[in-house]
Design a protein with these regions (language model features):
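Conserved alphaE helix
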Residues: 121-129
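Short beta-strand micro-motifs enriched in acidic
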Residues: 91, 151-153
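Short, glycine/acidic-enriched loop or turn micro-motifs at the edges of active sites
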Residues: 107, 145, 163
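C-lobe/activation-segment region of protein kinase-like
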Residues: 157-235
Length: 241
């Protein structure tokens, strides 16, 4: 195996990852090509069985594990909250071989689907997280509750970074798509209340540097307001006006 670190404890897990996966005490995800399991006090993710396009990407852009590791490192350096990635590796000299990623195990964290708490506060924190993500030049094409962990103190963390892209200045259309997608998939009930949407959008725009109330509302209302998740927010503001 070729690993990204020299730490003996991590290298030991990557020397024979299949054996460790086979004896894992807990499987978080098993979808054939992608397996996520608890291994030696860490979370291991394995990608395997991908076809020609993925092999081409591996040749020119690195394995899925390497790309996820680089993405997590970039997010950490940008100050965007994510689960620490510790190492990654793949079988040397084997075309299409599985690749493996080791991450920290946050035992007390839950994904957003299972989280229970103050929805207004969470909407605000999610707005800040996604706003910072965009402000630092990243987008995530698969924002959804299962790709967000929440720590015991209520801090949301991005996980599953396959959909992460570094694009430099984020186009407004892409930013709106990310915001609306997360709004559509947020904690049940499926749609945001006017207060939750307002908290989300205001904190999002504050993180983007849109300082004035008029500024952030002008930027997002016209496009996000066309979607079901934000229509109630627009109607509520018109009523108050």
């Amino acid at each position: 195996m070729r690993a990204s670190v020299d730490d003996p404890a991590l290298a030991h897990l990557l020397c024979d990852p299949e054996t460790h996966l086979a004896h894992s005490p807990r499987i978080f995800k098993n979808e054939g090509r992608c397996v996520v399991a608890l291994v030696g006090g860490y979370v291991m993710k394995r990608w395997s069985g991908y076809g020609g396009l993925e092999r081409w990407k591996t040749r020119w852009r690195g394995t899925r594990a390497a790309r996820a590791g680089w993405a997590a490192t970039a997010l950490e350096q940008a100050g965007v909250a994510t689960v620490p990635v510790l190492a990654w590796g793949t079988r040397e000299g084997v075309i299409g071989a599985p690749s493996y990623l080791l991450m920290a195990y946050l035992a007390d964290a839950v994904d957003l689907r299972s989280w229970q708490g103050n929805r207004l506060e969470m909407a605000e924190r999610l707005g800040g997280l996604i706003g910072l993500l965009h402000e630092r030049g990243f987008t995530h094409r698969d924002l959804k509750p299962s790709n967000l962990l929440v720590t015991p103190d209520g801090c949301p963390l991005l996980i599953d970074l396959d959909g992460l892209r570094s694009v430099g200045p984020v186009p407004r259309s892409r930013a709106i798509a990310d915001v609306v997608k997360l709004g559509r998939r947020m904690v049940a009930p499926s749609s945001l209340t006017p207060s939750e949407a307002s908290r989300f959008l205001s904190r999002y725009c504050l993180a983007r540097g849109f300082r004035g109330r008029r500024n952030w509302w002008t930027v997002l209302r016209e496009e996000a307001g066309r979607h079901d998740e934000f229509r109630t927010l627009r109607a509520a503001r018109k009523t108050r006006a």
